[in-house]
Structure formats: C-alpha cells, structure tokens
Amino acid sequence: MKNPYLSIVIAGRNDNYGGDFNQRLQNTLDWISHWVNHYHLPAELIFVNYNPIAENDSIAEMITFPVATSYFSTRIIEVAEDVHQELLEEGIRKPVPFFEFIAKNAGIRRAKGKFILCTNADVVFDPQIFEFLSKQNLEEGVFYRATRVDFNSKEKLIFAGNEANFLAQVHRNVFKYFMRGGTYLLKSPLSLYTTFRLLNIYNFVRRLFYTAIYPFRKITRIFYIPFSEELFTFQYACNASGDFFLMDKESWLKERGYPEDTWIATHCDSLHLLMTAVSGVRQKNLPWLVYHQEHERRFNFDTENHDMNLMYHHLLANGAVMTSQKCSFNTNTDDWGIFNYDLEETNV
C-alpha cells in the first residue's frame, strides 16, 4: 500500500518469548487484520524482525502473516544480527538480544502512514478503537493513549475468526488495570466497562488527593501515607504507555522516536511520553481499552531487580526535571531508528 492512513508498528523475534509468544503474536496479527478490513481502514502493519536466531525457524515459518488486501498490507523489516552487534555499547545498553525500542524506531522511520501507532506484539485493541480510527479524524500535534488491561486464562485464548466469543473470554479474564498514576489488581463480577468506569472515578479522586498533598509529601510520609515520588505520574498517562501510543508521523520524526540510550527497555516508553508531552504535543486519552495477553517476562515488576530499580529512578529523576522545566532529554542522533543501515524488507 503506497499511502496508508495508519502504520501499526510492532517488533519481535523468533525466540517464542515467554513460552507462548508465537500464539500471542498470531492472535494480535489476526485481530488487527480482521478489524482493519472490517472497517475498511487503509493501514499497513510493520513487523520489525529484530536479531533473529539463525538456528531457529524463521518468524515467517512460525507465524502466518496476514495476506494483503485493498485496505491492508504487511511489511517485515529485518534487523540482522550483525547490525545488532554494532548497537552494543558497554555502559549504555544492557547487552540483551532484543533492543525493543530501537526496533520500534526502525519501523517508525520507515513507516508510510500519515499516523503511526506503536504497540506490542501481544496486544489486541477493543473493536471500537478500530471503528474510531476508520473515521480518519485524528489530529496532528496530538498523541493518543488507551488504557491497558491484562487478561489470562487457564487455557490460552485463540482468536479463530469468532470475534464475539474471543472478546467475551477476554473480558471475563481481565485481572489488572494500568491507570494513570496507579495499577490495580481486580477481578470484578461487573461487566468490564462498568468496572473500568467505576475504577476511573476512584482513580480520578485518588489523583486529586495525591496532587493536593504533594506539597506536603514529607509530612504525609510521617503518617505512613504512601506516595509516588513525583507528581508527573498522576499528570501523564505513562503507565504501560508502550502498549498504545499513536501520533502523526511528522511529530514522531520531530521528537526522534523513543530514546535509544536507556540501560534496559523498562520505562523507556514513559520517558518517551514525557519527552513528547513537554515538547508541546497534546495528550488525549481514548475511552476504550487495549487487552494485553499475560505471559512470563524478562523483567518482572513483582520481583526485586537492580536493572529495573535503576531505570525507575532514572525515570523519576529525568521526568521531574522535564516536567518542571518543560524540556526534553531525547539524545537520539539523526540516524535514530538504524536509519544509516539499508535493512532487508519483505512485503507479504
């Protein structure tokens, strides 16, 4: 497709990350293809195949990528192992085999769409999001966010063309909500969106409370009132922002994508959101949810981890300065997104 309205960028590799990456990715691809074609949304999917493992089957052998239609096309962009090796920098990036946000930047730099949506390879969007996008009324100079919820089940859910059944199972198995300024573990007997609306009200009041007592945070700690270190966590939709971040291409290029000099990927999405917001791009939050398929992960928020602590304090320190001084710290060079390399590309 020469002139898609929307480019959807995701990244991954042929390592079956978390033990079931292939099935999660297949769900995501099938879901996107189904709804893009259903709503006649001119879109391209860009899958950045980062540092593939030579001895494993290729990602094209593991996954059935959607066939091209008059409304939808798929491009696979490969970042080969030798390119990955060139990106290893001691003391700058932890030497892991997958640099998530450099991979996404590679897709962003090469996207053809007027608007670019970055998401993850195991996220499915509420159908109303596709309907909204199909109206082609997105604004330039605005970034769009959607709240992520996590779902799991005893048996892995597989989307096999029955969207109503799949979505009903997803709704029944939601157990975690990533709201602005707070994450909530909650299994509710109410419908998902009723629960979400009630939780939004509670979270709004909670944000007002913590914003009000922020000037007195040193005193409140004496009374054991838990407090996030910085006010910006309540002001901006940083929580799980890497699962849905939509913006016009011109703004993506102006902001130079995600920061590429972070030690690990954790909180890189939050840093990027703050960099974008303080640069004057307006924030809009969509009223619909995106559904993340729960899995085992490399960096887990539930366990103590030095690298994650390091990145969290990096976020707090830099976020506080950026939001108070309204200045961005993105140090990406002009060749961000591996733009100085001619990457191999396959059209599906």
Question: What positions do the PLM features span?
Answer:
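Active-site-proximal specificity loops/subdomain of glycosyltransferases
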Residues: 57-110
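Conserved catalytic core of nucleotide-sugar-dependent glycosyltransferases
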Residues: 95, 108-109, 126-260
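N-proximal low-complexity "stem/linker" segments adjacent to membrane-targeting elements
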Residues: 1-37
